[in-house]
A protein has these predicted regions:
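Juxtamembrane, membrane-proximal amphipathic segments and lipid-exposed surfaces
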Residues: 9-153
Length: 153
């Protein structure tokens, strides 16, 4: 039997359990995750059509997949994951993230933070609020990030 710990530790345990992650993901999709993912994918298509927005299009599609099925996944920097720089993690990625932040990132993060606060009001919504916090962080600076499964603890 596990010792009781902090709320964050409990949520991390839930995310590491594949069955609970799947159940929470299904609830997430039904309660708005599908619409959020479709919004991110639409933004990705718009960015791709402009050609100039191609670097951000990839990020929108990654975030869209993450926002569709967030439990059991986490966003990490590709440099930390691979141990080397690539186009999105070097100086061009930094410029891309600054431009993204100025144009759209902070608006999207505010939206996710507002949703997180609304979820935190209820006990049942706390796991969903934590997912909105994860999405707010990646929405601020998505270039150079990737989504990977949470490691079992």
């Amino acid at each position: 039997m596990r010792e009781s710990g902090s709320l964050c530790a409990e949520i991390a345990f839930l995310e590491a359990s594949p069955m609970l992650s799947s159940l929470l993901n299904v609830l997430w999709v039904v309660l708005g995750g599908l619409m959020m993912a479709l919004g991110w994918w639409l933004a990705g298509l718009i960015c791709a059509i402009t050609v100039v927005g191609l670097p951000w299009a990839r990020s929108c599609f990654v975030i869209g997949r993450f926002s569709l099925w967030p439990f059991g996944q986490e966003a990490v920097n590709r440099r930390d994951l691979r141990g080397r720089d690539d186009l999105g993690t070097g100086s061009l990625g930094l410029i891309g993230n600054v431009l993204w932040f100025l144009v759209a990132g902070w608006w999207l993060a505010i939206g996710h933070l507002s949703s997180a606060l609304a979820c935190f009001v209820t006990i049942v919504g706390i796991p969903f609020g934590i997912q909105h916090m994860k999405l707010a962080l990646i929405a601020l600076a998505p270039v150079g990030m990737t989504v990977v499964p949470v490691r079992n603890v």
